[in-house]
Amino acid sequence: MEKLFALQERKEALRIVLEVRKVLTRVSSVMRSNYYVAREEIKNDGGNVYLFDAYFCEVYDCFNDDVNLFNEFTYNYEGTTEDIKEMFIDLYGEDVDALPDCLRNAINWDDVISDFIRFDCIAVNYNYDTYYFRNV
């Protein structure tokens, strides 16, 4: 059973990696560079890089592949926690269970979600505790 679980985890990780590659081909070189730097810092701090990758893709998908809007949001966003919460509710509805796993497990509405929208990149909270980057 453990081997099966490990295999499923590897398949999911590969799926996420392929999705990230697809996204990265469509974003600016600056964002690509920032993504790699942020991912390396998470890895060095023992964070969950696959959750970071999945969150990166989910946020990108939220903007319906609109690269300009995505870049504007990730580079210039200065909204409040409530603004970000409303954005996800608009997309996924009030039911938290409707959120993708990586968002449902990563977001605590009571904390400042905008901490994720930093680094002129996205989705990295430099606190790296297990609350934000726990396994899904």
Language-model features: locations:
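Acidic interaction surfaces
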Residues: M1-V136
